[in-house]
Amino acid sequence: MPATQMMTAEVPGMYRRLASAIGAEHWQGAVARQEEAIRSNHFLGDYLRSEYAIAYQLDRLRGVVARFGTVPYEIYNDPDIFPSLAFTAQVLGVLERSTVKQAKAFVKRVRNAFSRSEELHGLRLELLAATHFARRGQHVAWHRVSNGGTFDLLVEGIGPSGLEVECKSISENKGRRIHRRDALEFWGALWRDVADIAQDLRSGLAVVLTVPYRLPTDVAQRAALAREVVARIVTGSGAALGGGAGVRGCALKSSILQKLK
């Protein structure tokens, strides 16, 4: 059964227990990797900090503990870190009900979650679903703890054999051929050249890039596509590009630009 409530006085001890079980270096490393990516492309900032929000919140606690030796009241009573506190309580709840072997496997999964945002979203969804049923007073068995079944959760007391729950996390990229990070990385590469060009513009310019399926995954091909797009912007004309891609542009009215500010 996952934790469904906590007292603020428990926060410092809970964070220390989580750091001891999982290792603070995992969320510290996750934050460091995102910040490195952001330094190379500032357009990734909002996206990566949102995707790894739990890691950022836990790393904030890590820094506070390193500085003060504990988590001050002003920090653990800040709503901005509540999601990470819920995550902490839920993870510790699973570990408390695990055998040594099961706990070792779960710790590995939590550590891996800080390496990939998709894994972190999936883990949080399972914890959230388990907490939902626990708040309703039902007993929840986690198959990753009991090592039974092919489902994520078993909610006992519903139906003759309980309710099997399979959790599927759906991100904002679901159904999109071009994922947001790919688009932001491509725009970051374009901006290195477009920023200088934009300074000489005397009117607005809207540019639309169309690709047949997805942006190239190969670094060299993506760089070549970026150069072609920049060349079209310089000439101010659209054209069909290699690989089935195409660029078209049109004047953007100043009134529209004012609305975007």
Predicted segments with their positions:
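A short acidic/basic microdomain associated with nuclease active sites
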Residues: 135-156
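Metal-dependent nuclease catalytic core centered on acidic motifs
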Residues: 2-13, 23, 46, 72-96, ...
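Enriched - but not universal
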Residues: 29-35, 145, 190, 194
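Conserved catalytic cores of phosphodiester-cleaving nucleases, focusing on short active-site segments
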Residues: 133, 153-155, 161-169
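Short acidic/polar capping segments at secondary-structure boundaries
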Residues: 119, 144-148, 170-172
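Acidic-basic catalytic patches of nuclease active cores, encompassing PD-(D/E)XK
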Residues: 107-141, 191-210
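Interdomain/boundary linker segments immediately adjacent to catalytic/signaling cores
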Residues: 21, 26-123
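Gly/lys/ser-thr-rich phosphate-binding loops in alpha/beta enzymes
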Residues: 1-17, 131, 142, 148
